[in-house]
Amino acid sequence: MKKIFIIAAMAVAGISTANAQEFKVGAKAGFLMSNVSVDSSSDIEAGKLITSKLNTAFRPGFHFGAFIEYGFNEKIWVEAGVDYAFQGAKLKSVEGTVINVSDGSLIVSKKANIKNGSLKTQQFNIPLWVKYDISGFRPKVGVNLGFLSKVKENLEIEGAPAVQNTINESLTPDKKFDFGLGFGAEYNLDSGLFFDATFNLGLTDLSNKQKVVLNQSGGVARTVEPQTFKNRVIQIGVGYKF
């Protein structure tokens, strides 16, 4: 009987240890490069098709957060976390064209460079991952739920009139929810230290529709579709799991 109790106690201890190892919590921080995917905007006014395009580039930022991880077995793991990220994009130039709708002829085409241009955003992210372990190396795929908290725009358009060539303002975003797909990988050391790299492909259009007055004397206003933009974020981080 004594042997049975000893074996049972050892089994319970083994199960408890295994279960304890299935759940892990951790924290991480790191560097990121972010950009926004921008589509052209267009409008028709007085028989003219007016299009504009904003050209952007990646800008550096950083992120930090915490997470919980669960292992169904030695291979399959899932993770849910909370991350705060400083994202955005560099604003490089703006291009515009005016085309005659009746015959398709080009009336004017111009490009203006942007000096010291930046779009700075701060965002809460909830990344959800599914991972597969290969001797500590874990490829992962998932989704990212983002909540935009702050937006600031800085730019100076070269060659524009002095009264309207500079913008430096903080914006209150009307669209705050951002949904995206995540792809990445991490490498785990036995000590609990790990390194990871991820890419977030934003699918949500974060621009806003706005009404502009095209004929002030007649009081005519209509809604114009602005340029759409979606997040593109590369993150590289280091963290520790407990």
Model-derived segments and their meaning:
Residues 1-28, 238-242:
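Bacterial Sec-dependent N-terminal signal peptides
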Residues 20, 73-75, 134-137, 190:
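Outer-membrane beta-barrel channels and translocator barrels
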Residues 22-77:
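Start-of-domain marker
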Residues 27-31, 62-72, 82-84, 126-132, ...:
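Residues on the lipid-exposed face of transmembrane beta-strands in outer-membrane beta-barrel proteins
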Residues 35-59, 86-122, 148-178, 204-235:
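Extracellular/periplasm-exposed beta-strand and loop segments of Gram-negative cell-envelope proteins
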Residues 60, 192, 200-204:
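Short Gly/Pro-enriched loop/turn and capping motifs at secondary-structure junctions
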